[in-house]
Amino acid sequence: QTEAYFKKLGEQSDRATYTVIGKTEEGRDQFMLVVTSAENYKKLEQYKKISRQLGNADISQDEAVQLSKMGKAVVWIDGGLHATETVGIHQLIETAYQLLSRNDDETKRILDDVIILMTHANPDGHELQSNWYMRENKPEKRSTANLPRLYEKYAGHDNNRDFYMLNLKESQNIGRQL
Protein backbone atom coordinates (compact mmCIF):
# COMPACT_ATOMS: atom_id res chain seq x y z
CA GLN A 1 0.00 0.00 0.00
CA THR A 2 2.88 2.37 0.72
CA GLU A 3 4.32 1.82 -2.73
CA ALA A 4 0.95 2.44 -4.40
CA TYR A 5 0.51 5.63 -2.36
CA PHE A 6 3.97 6.91 -3.30
CA LYS A 7 3.32 6.11 -6.97
CA LYS A 8 0.09 8.10 -6.79
CA LEU A 9 1.90 11.03 -5.18
CA GLY A 10 4.51 10.96 -7.93
CA GLU A 11 1.79 10.99 -10.58
CA GLN A 12 -0.35 13.73 -9.06
CA SER A 13 2.03 16.18 -7.40
CA ASP A 14 4.46 18.54 -9.09
CA ARG A 15 6.48 18.34 -5.86
CA ALA A 16 7.18 14.59 -6.00
CA THR A 17 8.75 11.98 -8.24
CA TYR A 18 8.44 8.24 -7.64
CA THR A 19 11.32 6.04 -8.74
CA VAL A 20 12.45 2.44 -8.25
CA ILE A 21 16.04 2.34 -7.00
CA GLY A 22 16.49 -1.42 -7.42
CA LYS A 23 15.24 -4.86 -6.46
CA THR A 24 15.32 -6.32 -2.95
CA GLU A 25 16.75 -9.70 -1.97
CA GLU A 26 13.30 -11.23 -2.50
CA GLY A 27 12.72 -9.45 -5.82
CA ARG A 28 10.45 -6.63 -4.70
CA ASP A 29 10.85 -3.09 -5.96
CA GLN A 30 12.66 -0.80 -3.56
CA PHE A 31 11.30 2.67 -4.17
CA MET A 32 12.14 6.25 -3.42
CA LEU A 33 10.08 9.43 -3.45
CA VAL A 34 11.97 12.62 -4.30
CA VAL A 35 10.24 15.67 -2.79
CA THR A 36 11.12 19.29 -3.55
CA SER A 37 9.57 22.39 -5.09
CA ALA A 38 8.36 22.32 -8.67
CA GLU A 39 10.94 25.02 -9.43
CA ASN A 40 13.79 22.83 -8.13
CA TYR A 41 12.73 20.00 -10.45
CA LYS A 42 13.61 22.23 -13.40
CA LYS A 43 17.25 22.22 -12.25
CA LEU A 44 17.38 18.78 -10.60
CA GLU A 45 20.17 17.46 -12.83
CA GLN A 46 22.25 20.56 -12.07
CA TYR A 47 21.72 20.03 -8.31
CA LYS A 48 22.75 16.37 -8.64
CA LYS A 49 25.94 17.43 -10.41
CA ILE A 50 26.72 19.97 -7.68
CA SER A 51 26.16 17.35 -4.97
CA ARG A 52 28.52 14.92 -6.73
CA GLN A 53 31.16 17.66 -7.00
CA LEU A 54 30.78 18.49 -3.29
CA GLY A 55 31.36 14.83 -2.49
CA ASN A 56 34.73 14.93 -4.24
CA ALA A 57 37.61 15.21 -1.79
CA ASP A 58 39.78 16.92 -4.42
CA ILE A 59 37.94 20.25 -4.45
CA SER A 60 39.27 23.25 -2.60
CA GLN A 61 37.56 24.97 0.31
CA ASP A 62 36.73 27.94 -1.93
CA GLU A 63 35.19 25.65 -4.57
CA ALA A 64 33.15 23.87 -1.89
CA VAL A 65 31.80 27.15 -0.54
CA GLN A 66 30.89 28.36 -4.03
CA LEU A 67 29.18 25.06 -4.93
CA SER A 68 27.25 24.98 -1.67
CA LYS A 69 25.83 28.41 -2.48
CA MET A 70 24.70 27.16 -5.90
CA GLY A 71 23.26 23.86 -4.71
CA LYS A 72 20.48 22.65 -2.46
CA ALA A 73 20.64 20.73 0.78
CA VAL A 74 19.81 17.06 0.26
CA VAL A 75 18.02 15.29 3.12
CA TRP A 76 17.75 11.50 3.28
CA ILE A 77 14.81 10.03 5.21
CA ASP A 78 14.33 6.29 5.26
CA GLY A 79 11.81 4.20 7.09
CA GLY A 80 11.18 0.58 7.87
CA LEU A 81 14.79 -0.48 8.30
CA HIS A 82 13.78 -2.84 11.10
CA ALA A 83 10.57 -4.52 9.98
CA THR A 84 9.21 -5.00 13.49
CA GLU A 85 9.47 -1.25 14.13
CA THR A 86 6.46 -0.44 11.97
CA VAL A 87 6.27 3.26 12.79
CA GLY A 88 9.35 3.88 10.64
CA ILE A 89 7.58 3.31 7.36
CA HIS A 90 4.43 5.06 8.58
CA GLN A 91 6.37 8.25 9.29
CA LEU A 92 7.42 8.34 5.63
CA ILE A 93 3.76 8.34 4.62
CA GLU A 94 2.89 11.12 7.06
CA THR A 95 5.96 13.22 6.18
CA ALA A 96 5.25 12.92 2.45
CA TYR A 97 1.62 13.87 3.03
CA GLN A 98 2.57 16.96 5.04
CA LEU A 99 5.18 18.15 2.55
CA LEU A 100 2.94 17.63 -0.46
CA SER A 101 -0.38 18.88 0.88
CA ARG A 102 0.60 21.98 2.84
CA ASN A 103 1.05 25.42 1.30
CA ASP A 104 2.13 27.45 4.31
CA ASP A 105 5.28 29.59 4.19
CA GLU A 106 7.38 27.15 6.23
CA THR A 107 6.59 24.19 3.97
CA LYS A 108 7.25 26.26 0.85
CA ARG A 109 10.60 27.38 2.29
CA ILE A 110 11.60 23.79 3.06
CA LEU A 111 10.66 22.66 -0.44
CA ASP A 112 12.54 25.58 -2.01
CA ASP A 113 15.69 25.01 0.07
CA VAL A 114 15.85 21.21 0.25
CA ILE A 115 15.67 18.11 -1.93
CA ILE A 116 14.26 15.29 0.18
CA LEU A 117 14.88 11.63 -0.65
CA MET A 118 12.39 9.30 1.05
CA THR A 119 13.05 5.56 0.82
CA HIS A 120 11.54 2.37 2.17
CA ALA A 121 14.65 0.67 3.56
CA ASN A 122 13.26 -2.86 3.98
CA PRO A 123 10.27 -3.77 1.79
CA ASP A 124 10.82 -7.52 2.28
CA GLY A 125 10.77 -7.27 6.06
CA HIS A 126 7.71 -5.02 5.97
CA GLU A 127 5.82 -7.51 3.81
CA LEU A 128 6.80 -10.39 6.10
CA GLN A 129 5.78 -8.48 9.22
CA SER A 130 2.47 -7.38 7.69
CA ASN A 131 1.59 -10.91 6.58
CA TRP A 132 2.49 -12.28 10.02
CA TYR A 133 0.28 -9.75 11.79
CA MET A 134 -2.66 -10.12 9.39
CA ARG A 135 -2.61 -13.95 9.34
CA GLU A 136 -5.64 -14.00 11.66
CA ASN A 137 -8.91 -12.70 10.20
CA LYS A 138 -10.25 -11.52 13.55
CA PRO A 139 -8.37 -8.46 14.86
CA GLU A 140 -8.66 -9.60 18.48
CA LYS A 141 -6.69 -12.76 17.61
CA ARG A 142 -3.79 -10.91 16.01
CA SER A 143 -0.51 -11.07 17.85
CA THR A 144 2.24 -8.49 18.11
CA ALA A 145 4.68 -11.19 19.23
CA ASN A 146 7.90 -11.37 17.25
CA LEU A 147 8.07 -13.37 14.07
CA PRO A 148 9.04 -17.01 14.59
CA ARG A 149 11.72 -16.82 11.89
CA LEU A 150 14.71 -14.79 10.82
CA TYR A 151 13.75 -11.86 8.66
CA GLU A 152 15.83 -9.79 6.28
CA LYS A 153 17.01 -12.70 4.24
CA TYR A 154 20.72 -12.63 5.12
CA ALA A 155 21.20 -10.10 7.90
CA GLY A 156 18.33 -10.70 10.30
CA HIS A 157 17.44 -7.61 12.31
CA ASP A 158 20.92 -6.20 11.70
CA ASN A 159 20.39 -4.88 8.19
CA ASN A 160 21.46 -1.44 9.44
CA ARG A 161 24.90 -2.91 10.13
CA ASP A 162 25.26 -3.82 6.46
CA PHE A 163 25.95 -0.26 5.33
CA TYR A 164 29.70 -0.64 5.66
CA MET A 165 29.84 -3.91 3.66
CA LEU A 166 26.85 -3.42 1.32
CA ASN A 167 26.15 -7.14 1.05
CA LEU A 168 22.36 -6.84 0.75
CA LYS A 169 20.66 -5.57 -2.39
CA GLU A 170 18.69 -3.11 -0.25
CA SER A 171 21.91 -1.61 1.14
CA GLN A 172 23.43 -1.48 -2.33
CA ASN A 173 20.35 0.29 -3.71
CA ILE A 174 20.51 2.88 -0.94
CA GLY A 175 24.28 3.25 -1.32
CA ARG A 176 23.90 4.11 -5.00
CA GLN A 177 21.54 6.95 -4.09
CA LEU A 178 23.82 8.41 -1.47
What would you call each of these model-derived segments?
Residues 36, 47-81, 86-178:
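Active-site/substrate-binding loop(s) of hydrolase catalytic cores
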Residues 29-31, 40-51:
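N-terminal low-complexity, intrinsically disordered segments
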